[in-house]
Each structure stands twice: as structure tokens, then as C-alpha cells.
């Protein structure tokens, strides 16, 4: 029986509805951790102020690329920018690793008929977090490099590696073996993965657009709320990909 996107969407939404309390709490916890790490390690406002561009320089820098703008910065400005980028990347990486590890553990426990809370899922995921951290760090680095050169290579790499966290968690594979297996399965099932990932990217971009316009709440609270919504979108995508992999797994194991 062929695998259809409608079946996967239905199964994913059913799982999300049945486990909404645990998934919502997991999304909120990881969003809170990400925002708190970001605020804790972010440079002080005095240091950030040196990154501000005078109004008369905005029009002159409008036609410059990002690399050209960075090259025109002073060494002090470049160091502050590097620290800001490193803190943002580190905070997002930690939050994403906890979200992915906790959610994959939650899915596995529920599949075995066990009920676990969000905190229990994170606790039970601790043994797999180091491998997930390395995998997601490498994946993030490679995807960012792809996006730097052109958008299409970055998106293609993201699609290729989309199943790797699930594979490295469920199979006794090394990180690079999981990435290779993910690429093979992903490109063999592009019609099922690409629409889901494009929808996920669209939701992420919409939330990114709303951040600067969400002025009803204090900035920190607004960031946590929007990060939670972003995590929920990622959770739904991960449930979808997990369900897809479980259906593909017997076939993929037979070919190995």
C-alpha cells in the first residue's frame, strides 16, 4: 500500500491532538531555555550599541552585501557581532536539541503504551542528547554554509538531513552513517518530504516576520510566545517525519 501525504498529515495531527499537553509544555520549556540562554550570554547593551548604524550610513550601505558591510566594520564591532551570532546560534542549538530529543523520546514512549510528561521525556532523552548535539551542530553548520552560497543548496541539504535525528536516535548508526541514510531516504521520497518542509519554512518565516510587530507583550514574553509557536511547528514536522520513517524503515532495513 503506497504511503500518501494525507495519511501522514492525519496521523501527525491525531498524535499532536492526543499529546497536546505534553508537546505544548515541551515547546514552552525549550523556548524558555533558548530565550534565557540568549539573554544570559548576550553582550551588554553598551556593547550592542556600537553595532548601530548612523542614519546617514543606512542609505549608503543599502546596496552592499552582508560580507561587504562586515568588512567595513571596526575590529571591535566585528567581535561584538561575532559574539552575538555565536550566542544566538548556541541558544537555538541547545533549545532545538532538547526539543528534538524530548519529542523523539515522547513519541517512542507513547508508541510503547507508556505515558510520560514533558519533563520525563527530556530526562529520558539525556543519553541520546550528546549524539543529537553533535549531529545537529554539523547539520546546522552545513545548512548555513549552503544558504550562504545560495538558498537552493541550503534547502536541499536541509531536506537531505531531515530524517537524520530520527535515524541516529532509533538505529545503532554513527552520525555520518545516519546522515547518509537520511539523504538516501529523503531524496527517494521527495514528494512526501518537500511539501511538509516548505510549509514548515513558511510558518517559520511568518513567525519571524511577526516578531518585530508583536508589541502587545513585553519583548521577552513575546519572544517566548513566538518561539513556542515555532517549536510547535517543528514538533508537528518531526512527528510527520517520524511517522514517515517508521513506514519506510522496513524497506530501508531490507536494502541495507
Swiss-Prot record:
The chain crosses the membrane at residues 20-40, 90-110, 118-138, 141-161, 192-212, 221-241. Pfam families: UPF0259 (PF06790). It is found in: Cell inner membrane. GO terms for cellular component: plasma membrane. It comes from the Bacteria. Keywords: Cell inner membrane, Cell membrane, Membrane, Transmembrane, Transmembrane helix. Its main location: membrane. It is a multi-pass membrane protein. InterPro entries: UPF0259. Belongs to the UPF0259 family. This is UPF0259 membrane protein YPO2199/y2042/YP_1997.
